[in-house]
Amino acid sequence: MSRGIIRTTFVAIAACMAIGTEGKTYDSYRGLVTAGYQGWFNAPDDGAGRGWYHYRGRDGFRPGSTNVDLWPDVSEYEKLYDTPFTFDDGTVARLPSPYDYSTVDTHFRWMKKYGLDGVFMQRFVGEVSNPSGKRHFNQVLDHAMRAANKYGRAVCIMYDLSGQDKRVAERLLADIDEVSRTHSLMDHGRNPSYLHHNGRPLVVVWGVGFSDRRKYGLDEAQAIVSGLRERGYSIMLGVPTYWRQLRDDTEPDPRLHDIIRQCDILMPWFVGRYDERSYPAFRHLIPEDMAWCREHDIDYAPLCFPGFSWRNMHYPREATHIPRHAGSFFRMQLDYCLESGAEMLYIAMFDEIDEGTAIFKTARRVPTATPGSTFVPLDEGIGSDHYLKLAGRAAKRLKKNLKRRR
């Protein structure tokens, strides 16, 4: 690690300790509604040296080439960057970067305002295994730890194994050791907002058991789970939709169930599996999954997502779009999970504008459409904070439900 990175980390920790906290300690995922937080966007002048990272498409970031389908509502950000896109009146469209603390602070302020309990910070093993990615994700994580304690929100590490090979276990375990030292994950008094579960700090591992020919497999997954257990962590596992039946998107290997039984929480991946029309035929999986988990003394976190779109990422082929219908699709899922007895909820995602699942504030007025880069505007009749409000209402209902059951 370079002196610059060490100094940046030290300053971030010192700032976090200096601002104080609301004294809110998160001892359990039960009773919480959280979202995934990508934090992977960059702008050329934000200091990260990554250009328009994750905003750009196959041919850079310009009209006709971008990976994002939604455009953020930028009216509340302190710092913004000019883009190559313009609006119909010729004004330059601008975007934020989470590499800036002010951007992350704004996001956590929204979480507090609308009642979202917190976020799982996505930490891509491939990204943090290279200097540029590690520098970026360490910076965003520093910001998030500071903002989480400032606003009394829960925060937790979620590792994404996508694109990894058979060395994934050693990379992940080395990284969590470093993160733990930097952010005092084992010391709840020093970092009260870091999410614990079943008496231990929680770490999420996403991408276990998928049947899409990944270079790592269940042997590597077992090494990760064993390594985290030995280090004293509670574990949430992100698995395919049909994990229980071992079919379709899931490896047909019963060892997956052995690994699941060693974990504390299970979260199956539902994004893109249904739309508003097909959800009623799909949703029976949730209570059936819950029953299996109860039988094996595992907590279950069902996933809800507000919609989906990756037209720009995959234009013109595979331009999938699952409409939001002004929130009715999202509300349908939230309602069913709460009525089915969910004790915790995971929302995909807070800031995912690449695949159109973001619940943070997005814009109705979007840049001028061009072939290959047509942005999806916010539905008419709702405010940019509509999905944050729906998530916050679900969090209130969840807490009331659990109180009634006690």
What does each model-found stretch correspond to?
Residues 1-2, 19, 35:
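Secreted/periplasmic carbohydrate-active enzymes, especially glycoside hydrolases
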Residues 1-9:
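Bacterial N-terminal signal peptides that target proteins for export
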Residues 8-11, 266:
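Short amphipathic alpha-helical "recognition" segments used for binding
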Residues 12-20:
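Hydrophobic h-region of N-terminal signal peptides that target proteins for export
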Residues 23-406:
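Glycan-processing catalytic domains of CAZymes
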